[in-house]
Amino acid sequence: MTVGYLRPTRILVDQNAIYENIQNELKHLEGTDTVIFPVLKANAYGHGLIPVAEAAQAAGAAGFCVALLDEALALRRANFTEPILVLGITQPSEIELAAANQISLTVGSLEWLQEATAIAQQVPYLHPVPIHLSIDSGMGRIGMRDEAELLAAYTFIKAHSDYFDFEGVFTHFATADDPDDTYFKEQSARFNQLMTALPERPRFVHVSNSATSLWHAACNGNIIRMGISLYGLNPSGNAIPDLPYPLKQALGIESELVFVKQVAAGTKIGYGATYEASEGEWIGTIPMGYADGWLRRMQGSTVLVDGQRCEIVGRICMDQMMIRLPKRYPVGTKVVFVGKSGDDEITLQEVADYADTIHYEIICDLSDRIPRVYTGLNEH
């Protein structure tokens, strides 16, 4: 994708915020042998894979989690040597590539192991691939669901140690960010029950996503898969406001006015002519649209200009949008979508609430054509 370096729209990423969020989690873990594997999937939740990995490494991350083998390989190409776990299912045909790059893979079934073995047997001098067995304790996504499945996979791995190294076992909680912990406790009990069936504990046993580490720390295994909290966002949204330590939001979004005009009452704005000026108004145009991730449902929300709230009027276009200004502002005036201006601030949570979604979706929808600008890490 072509990156729009020559227009004024920018995503601002504070690497120092990422550093501080990890440091605070490490303090939260003091006295334990638990380590942090930041979750860097989806371009580090839209923040930028390599710069976030650099900040996490500087802060003391012991390894990384990603969703795709491609993401793991990108980290290896950038000379990161820490352990990397692919949380999604990788095609068995890629076992040689994973082995050659010392990348740990998630396995959810005996069938995967059998297919991967048939491929591995054709590869001379294959280094054993580190395997993390996934237990489906109630998420309903991937993993072994009962003792028979788990033991069959474990037994197969031990019988084929030339190809596999039993490095870890894990589960994922569906409701760790919910004030009602009933189902969380059911999942936790189910995981512990299945763990007792294993003849040995591998090097890594992990259950904690961001929400689990924040509100159910007693359940922590020895890896925290630090996802959304790494980026300074509350996993629960507004549901559980109490946190064991402050989270510092790492991402901001800014642009500039590129066109300003005064319109008369009755003037219509945007596709579908859905907005009509009720009186004489100043209208500003911003070079950002739904192709950049600011979706059409954000019509009617506000941005900040000179510390003042300005409504998005008319339908958001693919590459541009219009706002109603309180007065004439010159072309080049800064516009804040996420961040502070004057005494006011727009948070990602506010944006998500308006869009009737979660902040995860807002940041992951941000297009790669918006340049990311990084600050802060040189302070450490």
Swiss-Prot record:
A Pfam entry, by short name: Ala_racemase_C
Classification via Gene3D superfamilies: Alanine racemase (3.20.20.10), Lyase, Ornithine Decarboxylase, Chain A, domain 1 (2.40.37.10)
Reaction equation(s) it catalyzes: L-alanine = D-alanine
Active site: 41, 271
GO molecular function: alanine racemase activity; pyridoxal phosphate binding
List of residues that carry N6-(pyridoxal phosphate)lysine: 41
Residues bound to substrate: 141, 318
EC assignment: 5.1.1.1
GO annotation terms (biological process): D-alanine biosynthetic process; peptidoglycan biosynthetic process
CC cofactor: pyridoxal 5'-phosphate
GO cellular component annotations of the record: cytosol
This protein's pathway: Amino-acid biosynthesis; D-alanine biosynthesis; D-alanine from L-alanine: step 1/1
Group of enzyme by EC: isomerase
SMART domains: Ala_racemase_C
Recorded family membership: Belongs to the alanine racemase family.
PANTHER family: ALANINE RACEMASE (PTHR30511), ALANINE RACEMASE, CATABOLIC-RELATED (PTHR30511:SF0)
Task of the protein: Catalyzes the interconversion of L-alanine and D-alanine. May also act on other amino acids.
Protein name: Alanine racemase
Organism expressing this protein natively: Latilactobacillus sakei subsp. sakei (strain 23K) (Lactobacillus sakei subsp. sakei)
Lineage of the species this protein comes from: Bacteria, Bacillati, Bacillota, Bacilli, Lactobacillales
